[in-house]
Design a protein with these regions (language model features):
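Residues that define the transmembrane beta-barrel architecture of outer-membrane proteins
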Residues: 23, 43-49, 95-99, 145-151, ...
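Repeated loop/turn-to-beta-strand initiation elements of outer-membrane beta-barrel proteins
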Residues: 23, 62-65, 113-115, 161-167
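Outer-membrane beta-barrel "beta-signal"
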Residues: 24, 32, 157-163, 193-207
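Membrane-embedded beta-strand positions of outer-membrane beta-barrel proteins
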Residues: 27-29, 67-69, 103, 117, ...
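Transmembrane beta-strands of outer-membrane beta-barrel pores
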Residues: 31-35, 71-75, 121-125, 169-175, ...
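Flexible, solvent-exposed loop segments that connect beta-strands
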Residues: 37-43, 73-97, 125-146, 176-193
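Membrane-embedded beta-strand positions in outer-membrane beta-barrel channels/transporters
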Residues: 50-54, 64, 100-102, 152, ...
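Outer-membrane beta-barrel strand-turn architecture
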Residues: 57-61, 107-111, 159-161, 207
Length: 207
């Protein structure tokens, strides 16, 4: 049900952005690299896909507002899970996917470069831990909450009127683990909280 709702919402946003008057818009296609702060692993080792749509509007000669809706894969990856001599031996990593809505203010630094910052909200589609065998089934309480909220900064390099390359760093401002709120902390004994951190690279194509 969550996935069907996300697909319908995504299609609705695309239709709205393509018909809205006085707005620009387009599509987004790229890659995400991510980590989860507080999962006792480190490094942007998790690769995933990023796909979506955007709508934007000029506020002044140098400022514009942009709203996006994207499907993005996040999480963490433990490349040393099977290395018995490494401190990360047998430590679980995380796979997650979200529908994300970034709200951005963009500043036109030059004719080819924009600087951007903003807020994001995200709805969790799926998330789970992985061990050496694969996905760890969730038998009782889901270890992840349904929503993620964060801050982001980025730059947008313009190749042409139609195409630009966006590089962006985002980070959760609230923990994403359910055990950080109300349940025994099964996965994180240090109780540091878990936070998504994402470095993404995406092509933006303007209609």
């Amino acid at each position: 049900m969550d996935k069907k709702f996300a697909i319908l919402f995504f299609c609705g946003f695309l239709t709205l952005s393509s018909h809205a008057q006085n707005f620009g818009g387009g599509v987004i296609l790229g890659l995400s690299t991510s980590q989860v702060g507080g999962d006792n692993l480190a490094g942007f080792h998790k690769a995933g896909f990023l796909i979506g749509v955007f709508a934007n509007k000029s506020i002044s000669e140098l400022l514009s507002f942009q709203m996006e809706m994207t499907f993005i894969q996040k999480g963490s990856n433990n490349p040393k899970m099977n290395d018995a001599d490494h401190p990360n031996y047998l430590k679980e990593d995380i796979s997650s996917s979200y529908i994300e809505i970034p709200l951005l203010l963009q500043y036109q630094q030059s004719s080819i470069l924009k600087i951007e910052g903003g807020l994001l909200s995200a709805y969790l589609i799926d998330a789970y831990y992985n061990d050496l065998i694969g996905k760890i089934p969730i038998h009782t309480v889901n270890p992840f909450i349904k929503y993620d909220f964060g801050l982001l900064l980025g730059i947008d390099y313009t190749f042409s009127n139609k195409l630009s390359l966006n590089t962006r760093l985002s980070n959760s401002i609230l923990p994403i683990g359910a055990e950080d709120y109300k349940h025994p902390n099964t996965y994180n004994s240090s109780r540091k909280g878990k936070y998504n951190s994402v470095l993404s690279f995406a092509l933006h194509y303007n209609f």
